[in-house]
Structure formats: structure tokens, C-alpha cells
Amino acid sequence: MNKNCDYCGLTIYSETYHKCVESSVKINDETKIVNYKIITIDELGILAGKNDREAQDEIVYRYLNQDAINLSQKNIKPINWENIIERAIDDQYFTYFLLFFAFDHDEYHVIFDVLFDVLFENVKLAAKTGDSMAQYNLGQMYYRGISTKKNIQKAIKWITKSADQNNKYGLINLARFYEYGDGVLLDIDKATQLLEQASCQNFSKAQFYLGRIYMYKDPPDYKLAFKYYQQAANQNHSSAQYFIAVFYKTGKCVAQDYKKAVHWLTLAASQGLNSAKIKLAEMYMKGIDVEQNYHKAFELLNSSIYDDGTNNYYDEVAMTELACMYKRGLGIEKNISKAIYLHIKSRNTKNIFKIFEINTITFINPINVDCENNNLSDIDQLESKIIYKLQFLMIKLKYEWSNIYHDDISNSLQEIENSFTRLIKLRIQLNNSSAMINCLSFKKNTSYKFDVFNTKNAYVNYYVYDDISYINIGLNNIKLVNNFQKNLDKFMFCNIFLDLELALENKHKEKIDDLINAVKNDDRSHQLNIVKDLDNIKFVLSQTKKISSKLIGYVNILMNDLKSNTHIRNQQFQLEYANIFGYD
């Protein structure tokens, strides 16, 4: 089982593949000589972010000469490195790295566009003076339309000039043009010849591309493919290491050897290659020439989707496998909610339908609201009427009936209005959401709906209202419905109204005492004012009882409103999760 560094917390796949990013001299209390050539791209990225120049240079080297572009990208942020413009002006290899990186990271395109606008003339000038690396970079800028118009013929012209000077980057990219017939006539033999020329410079990228050409040509030449993959793998090219492992695992053109397969997969996985992690996890799951270890398999799969910041086919494969592990409780505590989340994210509808079935039940008939003969036809009018009555009383108390005003009365009315307004907002949010749906339901005779009840931080939740089952999928939907449930509390409103009635009764007793004193003092004018105040208190009491009755009735009507709008929420859910219903 892998361990984690006591200092930085990162996974230590092996002592040779870890350098602590918090302590430059120690790994778990042991003094280590730092060797940037053998630490992972993730760790290099963290160090580079702290402007460790050696780490930055190693990242550039791996992008140029190996296949770092297929590895973890989460910590590689050259835009934050110091003096990148000056470095790019002085170093065409660094410019190549920035071009390579920018192409795969659209999120930085605005910043990089400005950067390359500055660099374009510098690259063009250097290319014209015969700098083979600048010629290659200029070709790439024309090919991708970076700081200039796209022009594939100019791209080929400058990359050919670079290749003519035996520049290995120019050679392999010109080979790609011929391999795919991009701007030139398709010519696999020409592509192979160019790659062999680059391979003679011990260039692992060229060796890998040669291996791929021989592997996928018609007919394939597996022996030559293995030869070139082996050469690249020996230079730490992770994708080549993966293919060497596949050769040994399948026994294609070499003797089947699971130990060697595990060895090469471990090397590639240690660098962060997702495909290798998934294949290695499979071997641990099945116990193929390694001790069966579900926990190890889970760690590998989990790191492939959460640790590397990529989003590709292999992420979806890993998510599907992880979902099955969560569903069965293999290597991790059983969690159906998490399994559903991963199945949905991986777009694996086949497995989703083992848990859910699609329903056609909807509610499309609008409700009619009849609350104490108010002739209201919809819930919006009822809400407006309740809000109006509450605000009417608050304004009267504050500006016209100041003699019976009391903070407890005002605060209770304000609390009722705030709680009711909050409930209205939640109703509107809910009916415009994809929560509380019934277009999906749990398969019958399964324990899934019961399992989700016991899940902390659930992604899926199951509710029953008025004998109708609803499902929520997604953290935001669950949070919304939980908040709605919390505010949909008749007892909360009842308690506030009890406080309000108590405050009004206290004010009524106070006025009765005032009236007795006024009678004793024979103060007729004051007596009339107090009688008027008592009438106002009775009016407020009668109105609050009516509002209370309407609010209790509103809660019941609200549930009917949610029921009648289920079809709208179903449609919204189907739009958000179109792949489940086969719409995309």
C-alpha cells in the first residue's frame, strides 16, 4: 500500500519517485539527495510554482522530450512563473513549451494571446536568421493561428526548414503532417523515414511515434512496434511504458509475463498516466500476478480522476470502475449515492439503469386555490394577499396605531413576513429547478433507496410527500430541498403566531388597566381613546387569526403546487441529464 509523506501529504509511490514539496532536504525524516529527473510531474509543478528554476526546467524538458502533456496538469501553471517573457525571448525551447502548453489550456488563452503577440516578431526574426528551433516555433504559430492568421502552407514551409537542419522537433512534426496527410499528400513511408531520422538522436517521442506507426499499420509489425516502444520506455516515456506492459500482459510478440507487465504499469502509473493506473488497478482487482488488493485498486482509480486535473476517456473508464466498487463496497465503504454520482458523471447509462428505471408519470393539471372563499385562482395571488395583510398591519401599527405599538408585536409580524417570504422564494426556486423529480425511480425489490438514507453528503436523496416518491440528484438540488423542508414547518408559524397573540393580549390587559384608571379619574377623552385602542387590538387579533389560518392552509396548497409542477421539473432534469434519456 502506498504511504503519504509526513510533510507535504502527497502519495509516495516509491522512494525514488518522491521529493517532498514542503521540505527540500527530508522525506519522512530521511535525508535525500534531490534528483529532479525522478520526481513526479505533480511534485515538480508544486516546486515550479514556488519558482524553483530546476523544477521548471525539468518540466520543460519532459514536455519537449517525453509525454508530460498526457500526465497530470493540475500543478503546472507557467503563467505564474517569474520572467516568462524574458525567458521565452532568450530561449526558443521555452517558447516551444509555452506553445505546447497553451494549446492544451484554453482557460489561459487571453493571457497567452497577449504573450505570443509580444513573442511573434522575435520568433520570426530568429527563424529568418536560421535558428532551427525558432523555425519550428514559427511553423507552429502559423499552423495554429497564434498571433497570426492560420496558414498551413507557411507552417509546413518553416517546419520543413527546421527538419532540414535535423532538428528533432521539426522532424517528428513534419512526420505527423505526412502520417495524416495534413497539408501534404499522405505518405506513411516518408513519415517513417523522418521519425527514424529523429529516433537516431535517441529522441523518445520519435521512438514512441515509430512504435505506434508499426503497431497500427496494415498489416501491423508488432516486433518493430515493441522495439521502438521499448527504446522510448527505457527513457521514461510513460505512454511507451504502458504499451510495453500491454505487450507483456497479452503475450503479443513476446512471452506473456505478468510480472513485467506490473513492473512497467507501475512505472507509468507512478508518473501519473491514467491508462496505466486503470490497467494496474484491474490487475490488483483480479489478483493477476499480484496479491488481490481492492484498496490499492481503489487508490489508483481514485487518483486517476481526482488527482490529475484531466478530463478524458480514461476518466470516464475510471469513474465507471469506481462506481462499481462503491456499489459493492470493494476497497471502500459501500456508498450507493457515490456510485450513482460516478455513473452519471461517466455517462454510463447502462449501469444507471441497473439502479433506476425511467417513468412517464407527470402532473400537468394546474391547481385551483380556494382559501376561505377568497376567489383566488393561483398560489401567487394567495401569497400576495397574505403578504399584503401582513404589511398592512405593520404599517398601521407603526404609523396610525402607535398607542398599541409594541416591539414584540412588530417583531413577530416581521418574523412571520420574513419566514413566509423565504418560503415563497424557495417554492419558486424549487419549481424552476431539476429537484423533486419522478421521471426516474429506484428499481423495485432493491435496497438502493434505503441505502441512500444512510449516506453522509449524499449526491442522491429520496423523499415521499403525500404518498408520492420523489428523487433529488445533485448536491445543489439536495441542499435546496433540505432548505425547503426546514422552512416548510407549520409548527414554526404556529409558535410565532402564539407569541404574537400573547403580545397582543398583554397590550390588551395594559389598555384595560389604563381604562380603569381613566374611569376613576373621570377622564372621558382618554376613555374614548383607550376604547378605540382596544378596538384596534381586537382588529389586529382577528386579522392575525385569519392570516394564521391562511398560512396553515397555504402549506397544504403549496404541496399541491409542487405536485402539479412536477412535469416542469422533470423536463428540466431531462435537459440537464440528457444522456440518461438518450437525447444527445
From Swiss-Prot:
The keyword Ribonucleoprotein does not apply. It comes from the Viruses. Transmembrane segments: none annotated. Sel1-like repeats lie at residues 132-167, 168-203, 204-237, 238-273, 274-309, 316-351. Keywords: Repeat. This is Putative sel1-like repeat-containing protein L18. It comes from Acanthamoeba polyphaga mimivirus (APMV).
